[in-house]
Amino acid sequence: MKANGLDNDPARTRMERTDIDSEHPEAQPLLNNNHRTLGAGSANGPAVNEGRDIESDGFIKDSLFQIRKGYRIFIHNSKWILNILILINTIWLVTTLISDFFFNINILFGFSNRYASFNDLTLIFISIIANSFNLWFNKLGLYSALDYSLNVTLCVLTLFNLALTYLIKYTRQRIGFVGTFTYLWTSFSFFIGAILDWYLLFYNNSINEPLEERRIDDANISTFNENHTNSTENRDRSQYGSGSPTPTHRSQLVQNKHTLTEWVSIGFRNTIKFLILIFFALFTLNTLLTTLDTYRLTHKLPITVQSPSYEAFHYVDAAKTYQLHITCYGDVFDQENNTDLSENKKQPIILFEHGGYDTGYLSATWIEELYHLDKIQRYCLYDRPGYGLSDSPPAPISIAMVAESLRYALIKDAKIKGPFTTVGYDLGGLFTRVFTAKNVDIVDSMMLVESWHEELLLKNYIQRLLPPGRGDGDDGDDGNGNDGDGRNHDKTWLPSEIERHNEFRLWWKGIWSSLGWRLQTSWLLAHHGSKERIYGRDMKYQGRFLRSKFLESVTSSILSYRDVTNNAESLQNVKTSIVSSKEMVKKSALWGDWQRDLTKISHKTQEWKIVEGGHEIYKYGLGKQQTQEVLLRLIGELGKLTED
């Protein structure tokens, strides 16, 4: 009985089982109660809820699976969208390039941008860069808070530039649908980048959140286990092994660690975005300055009072393609006295055509002086398309197209009927010849001042213009300024109006004109005013002007040269006077020959006067006075000048 009682003793049975378990470690449970238990129910520590722990691991795995599945779908869809956007951008870039600089495709769809410059092309190119970067760096490991901030800033800056453009009436009426959409599209590209960054941040946090919660639990357990003996820790280490990193390590790796390749990619992307930010900062300052200058010169326009001055914008055709800026002084609308007695007959309206790198604001000062001296009764100036305040023309453009546009703007839109005495200076001499030839019915006489010869429109005119010399010039041909043709290739004496800038150089200047740094220095350092920047000495830095010069250069040897030669016969019965610079004739015999040829375009040439001074005769006192006398003799008013 005793033996049986001993055998059935529960305490003894537990002791024996304990001895067996100690002798057979493989039979021990996977979780050691005195190490991983939580709660107050255990002698060695709180008891562990094994079901909850297993359920938590399963939940984390399922959650991460769903998140990563959504992330893969997001990456797949975003790649498709960005590739489509880049394709649209590329097609739009090519279309804009062709439409703005070679052939106006937009007119087929009824669109127009009368404020066209190089800005649209630059913005589209930047949007391509932005979308390409969104595509290449749209990865979880490449998320950067700085990139998100840059995208938001660039998006806001682009919209701010558009707001500045719409702030004043002049630019608001001219930018059109295409120009507006360009700004919105560029802003949308940066907005897409910000959205993608936001999604990357979302997936980053979604992946880290369950891992972070598990990390907190593991941290609490680790804190409790630090109170255990070293022998228990060694036994647990031998029992579980080293294994893979804990969720804590994985979370820290996702949150704080990047590979070297990722750091290089992030740095490259943020550097390019920062350079774009600098570009947009300068672009915004340029837009702000141009907006201020344009407002100062246009907020009182149109001035429709017929006397003593008139200034307004007039369309060039019935389709209202674009407008020319026309300014007149005197009573240019009075045609009633044309049939009166000779003593009461009105003088013809002096219609001045400015040069290639100026407007009437600079080169017509000698005519303005005659008006203030009451030697001429009335005169008109206009800015050619893309110059000054006139609208940007559609491509292509030629001399005949401008002449036809001017006729419509003057006669049909402005109701200024003439008659006119046309005066052309520099490149404007060619425009004057074509306009006069096409409008002999309303032109009384023509005067050419330092006018271009049509041969200057050809590509190789510089070599023929340069005088023979001893090789003291240098254009990089042989070190002595010669090119094997016996001519001196020193071009430094050529005026900027004559020395043609090739298309690539004009294009390069046009791209950089979007920054406007030369315009900024014009008021910061040179203290020039708004008139100087819009149609004065600094006009040559304006993007719209450079685009017009590019259009003129592209068609000069094709369309414009043919326009001048085809209309030459119509000038044979037009009363004409020629004024040439003495310095230019001395420096180039060919220039003198060309000026002589101009005297032969009409059978009624009144005189050929070689005046003192250089090409810009309005800057030389004696040369200016001599030119004024030629004009007064041409219109029969020299007596007024001699009497005074």
Swiss-Prot record:
One Gene Ontology CC term in the entry: endoplasmic reticulum
List of residues that carry Phosphoserine: S22, S56, S63, S244
Organism in which the protein naturally occurs: Saccharomyces cerevisiae (strain YJM789) (Baker's yeast)
Record-annotated membrane-spanning stretches: 91-111, 123-143, 148-168, 175-195, 272-292
Residue span of region Disordered: 1-39, 225-251, 469-492
Record InterPro entries: AB_hydrolase_1, AB_hydrolase_fold, DUF2417, Meta-cleavage_hydrolase
Ranges of compositional bias, category Polar residues: 239-251
Intervals, Vacuolar compartment: 112-122, 169-174, 293-644
Main location: membrane
Keywords, ordered alphabetically: Membrane, Phosphoprotein, Transmembrane, Transmembrane helix, Vacuole
Limits of the AB hydrolase-1 domain: 348-619
Full protein name: Uncharacterized vacuolar membrane protein SCY_4679
Subcellular location: Vacuole membrane
Lineage, highest ranks first: Eukaryota, Fungi, Dikarya, Ascomycota, Saccharomycotina
Record topology, Cytoplasmic segments: 1-90, 144-147, 196-271
Bias (Basic and acidic residues) ranges: 9-26
Membrane topology term: Multi-pass membrane protein
Pfam families the record matches: Abhydrolase_1 (PF00561), DUF2417 (PF10329)
Molecular function terms from GO: catalytic activity
